[in-house]
Amino acid sequence: MKPDIHPVYRTVVFHDTSANEYVKVGSTIKTEREIELDGVTYPYVTIDVSSKSHPFYTGRQKTFDSESSAARFQKRFGHFIGAKRG
């Protein structure tokens, strides 16, 4: 490996501001801010959405109508099928 070309890999604290949750993750992100957690100082990054707050991961997502578009079409226009023209 060539010296001095690889980014520094370290543990970084990401703060999900919408859920007020802190997550420690290994990362190469550069940051100016630091935070102290559990007596240890870590680089600190704020984020708006993470798996702690995203509706898909929390199970609080909106449910959509389970009726398919084909079923809706049949309900609206099914009576035209098989009708005699005349």
Curated annotation (Swiss-Prot):
Keyword Ribonucleoprotein: yes
Induction (free text): May be induced under zinc-limiting conditions; in that case may be repressed by the zinc uptake regulation protein zur.
Keywords noted in UniProt: Ribonucleoprotein, Ribosomal protein
GO cellular component: ribonucleoprotein complex; ribosome
A single BP term in Gene Ontology: translation
InterPro entries in UniProt: Ribosomal_bL28/bL31-like_sf, Ribosomal_bL31, Ribosomal_bL31_B, Ribosomal_bL31_sf
GO molecular function: structural constituent of ribosome
A Pfam entry, by short name: Ribosomal_L31
HAMAP family attached to this UniProt entry: Ribosomal_bL31_2
PANTHER family, per the entry: 50S RIBOSOMAL PROTEIN L31, CHLOROPLASTIC (PTHR33280), LARGE RIBOSOMAL SUBUNIT PROTEIN BL31C (PTHR33280:SF1)
Family: Belongs to the bacterial ribosomal protein bL31 family. Type B subfamily.
Oligomeric and partner information: Part of the 50S ribosomal subunit.
Record NCBIfam families: L31 (TIGR00105), PRK01678.1 (NF002462)
Protein name listed in UniProt: Large ribosomal subunit protein bL31B
Organism lineage: Bacteria, Pseudomonadati, Pseudomonadota, Gammaproteobacteria, Enterobacterales
Record gene name: rpmE2
